[in-house]
């Protein structure tokens, strides 16, 4: 609803508390997913349904943050984290998740991280995987421009954040058009 106030009903998008207002629902929905996964398991049908809704909420939030960055010079960096809860990739995904938690803690005023389950049966996830050429996990996409397969340490992620506008140096980083 808050996002609609700014987009559809033409409320001043660059107003003081816009970021906080549009972020409240995202944070609330994320906590619900965490609680449901702990209570019922990551593969529970109701949990998976809620994750589909959360994917939509995340993408709407990302879209709005892009508007704030473009029109209001918000200066918020973004990381899209593509992970797997399947046995084959869960350990690597959880390790990258821990790294991202640390990166976020160090940069919480200027960074947003959006997490997407690559195995979720969702048209939105399929479209994201196609858009960012995601065929495995874990993968992060920094500022929707730079893709890193299975980042190994904090420095790799933080350096990529710092130089997200620079050209590739030949590592496991891929620059997207």
Locate each region found by the language model.
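Loop/turn elements at helix/coil->beta-strand transitions in domains of secreted/extracellular proteins
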Residues: 76-77, 108-112, 136-137
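Typically the conserved alpha-helix immediately C-terminal to a functionally engaged Cys/Sec
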Residues: 90-107
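Sec-exported extracytoplasmic/periplasmic mature domains
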Residues: 62, 105-108, 162, 166
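Non-globular targeting/processing and membrane-anchoring segments
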Residues: 1-77, 166-177
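Second-shell loop/turn segments in exported
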Residues: 38-47, 84-91, 145-147
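Non-catalytic, surface beta->alpha helical segment in thiol-disulfide oxidoreductase systems
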Residues: 3, 19, 136, 141-177
